């Protein structure tokens, strides 16, 4: 599927306690807020785990990332469902006759509160 400027791609995921535990093991990001539940039994999801949402969309379209900017606006907890909307902003050819891509994204939780936003650029393989 060929992407177009202005196109919006959406991906949604619910983060589980198991996701946080596995990411803690792999990343060694063992901050107390990731390994100790809050009073509601929730764990804070690592920011880099949350940031896999826009990278999933890039991966689906064979984007080799060159630059990624993230702004983490509020915490994501285990049990939260996060929707990531990626909007294609620009395409341009590069010096090797490949296509550069620039995209913006925003991620909201199940309450429609923005939890993360940013942009990425790269090359479509």
Task: Name each model-derived stretch.
Residues 20, 26-29, 76, 88, ...:
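Hydrophobic aliphatic residue packing
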Residues 1-5, 78-81, 87-125:
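HotDog/MaoC-like acyl-thioester-processing domains
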Residues 10-14, 71, 121-123:
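Generic structural detector for well-ordered beta-strands
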Residues 67-73:
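Short alpha-helix capping/helix-loop boundary micro-motifs
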Residues 1-65:
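Hot-dog-fold acyl-thioester-processing enzymes
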């Amino acid at each position: 599927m060929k992407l177009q400027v202005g196109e919006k791609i959406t991906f949604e995921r619910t983060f589980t306690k198991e996701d946080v535990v596995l990411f803690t093991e792999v990343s060694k990001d063992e901050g107390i807020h990731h390994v100790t539940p809050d009073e509601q039994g929730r764990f804070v999801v690592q920011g880099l785990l949350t940031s896999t949402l826009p990278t999933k969309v890039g991966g689906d379209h064979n984007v080799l990332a060159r630059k990624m900017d993230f702004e983490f606006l509020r915490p994501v907890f285990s049990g939260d469902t996060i929707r990531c909307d990626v909007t294609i902003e620009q395409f341009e050819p590069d010096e090797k006759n490949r296509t550069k891509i620039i995209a913006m994204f925003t991620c909201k939780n199940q309450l429609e509160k923005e939890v993360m936003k940013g942009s990425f650029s790269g090359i479509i393989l």
